[in-house]
Amino acid sequence: MNEPSPSDWHLDAYDYELPPDRIAQSAVEPRDHARLSVFPDREQLWHRHFYDLPQLLRPGDLLIVNDTRVIPARLYGQKIETGVPVEVLLVEEHGPGYWLTLVKPGKRLKPGSAIAFGPNPEDPLLVADVEASDPATGGRWLRFRGEAEAFWSQLATLGEMPLPPYIHTTASDPERYQTVYSRELGAVAAPTAGLHFTPELLTTLADMGIATAPVTLHVGIGTFRSVDVEDIRQHEMHSERMMVPAATVEKIQATKAAGGRVIAVGTTSVRAIEGAAASGELKPGSDRVNLFIYPGYRWQIIDGLITNFHLPRSSLMMLVSALIGRDRLLSAYATAIAEQYRFYSFGDAMLILPDAKLP
C-alpha cells in the first residue's frame, strides 16, 4: 500500500533500540486491558486500550483469526543408552508420531539412539527413537513409540509450553499463551495478536455486525528467526502449514462485495490469506506457505491489521512496513517506547487501519 524506496531493502533500516524493561515478561490481565496504538492514515497515533476495539471498527468489517493451538512442545528426558539428560523441542509432525525436533545435546543423539521421557527412566511414559539427522535445521527426526492417542495424552502431562527466548519467566497458566479461539493443535508459538481477545469482546463485536473467520497457520520456530542478509529481498522465508476453509473464503468475498474491510488479526493470518491468494484468486485449501511480505508487496486481500510490536530486523517488521511504510512504522515504535508501551509476545498491540476515524 506504500511505494518502497531503495533504503527499504536494507536490513539495517529495520533496526531500533528497545530498553530491556519494555519487553513484556507476562501478559496483562484481563486480556483486553492491553494498550492499543491506533494507526490511521496521515494522522497522529491514537492511544486506546484493546477493549475499545468495538468503537474503532464498523459493522460489516471481518476479522481473520488464526485458530492454531500451541502444543506443549518442550520435553525433558534421558538418553536410554547412557542416561545423559536430553532436552527436546518438537518442531513439526510429519505423519503420526514422526517429528522434526531440535535437541540438546545434539552431538550425542545419533541415529539409532533412543530417548526416555517421564519421572522414572526405567518405566518411561514416552519413548522416542532417533531415526535421522536434519541438515537444514541441525535437528533430529524422532519417531515416538506407541499409539497417537497415548502420545498426545502423555505430551499434555510431560510437555512444557515453549515460550519465546526473550521471555525469562515460566508459564504459570499455560492457557494464557493460547488464544481463546484456539482449536487446531500444531503451533510451537502463539499467534500473539490474538491473545488480547476475550470471549466477551468477541461477543460484543459479533453483536455489532463485526464477524470473525478462521484460518489455521501452525506457527513454527522460524517466526523467531531474524533476517540475516543485508538486502532483504534475498531473504528466504521459512515455510509453515496452513489451511484456509471454504467458509472463510466465502465470508471474505461477501465482505468485499458489501464494501466491508478485511482485517487480519496477526501477521500469521496475513500470510495465510495473502498466501492463499498468491495466484491472484483467493482459494480455499491446505498448503505450505513461505510468503515473504516486504515493502513493494502488492496486497491482494487484507485492508487492515491488528499486530503486536515486533523484534528489530525481523520479517514481521518488514511485513507491517509493507502496509504503512517503514518510516511511519519506526516513528510509531519510537512513540510507543516513549509512551511506555510493552513490546513483543506478551506486549501491547497496534491497530493499523488506513481509513480509521476517531470515534
Swiss-Prot record:
Reaction catalysed by this chain? Answer: 7-aminomethyl-7-carbaguanosine(34) in tRNA + S-adenosyl-L-methionine = epoxyqueuosine(34) in tRNA + adenine + L-methionine + 2 H(+)
Annotated source species: Synechococcus sp. (strain ATCC 27144 / PCC 6301 / SAUG 1402/1) (Anacystis nidulans)
Q: How does it assemble?
A: Monomer.
Enzyme Commission (EC) number? 2.4.99.17
Check the record and name the HAMAP family matching this protein: QueA
Question: Which one of the record's GO molecular function terms can you name?
Answer: S-adenosylmethionine:tRNA ribosyltransferase-isomerase activity
What's the top EC group for this one?
A: transferase
A Gene Ontology BP annotation from the UniProt entry: tRNA wobble guanine modification
The Swiss-Prot or TrEMBL record describes its family as follows:
Belongs to the QueA family.
Q: What is this protein called?
A: S-adenosylmethionine:tRNA ribosyltransferase-isomerase
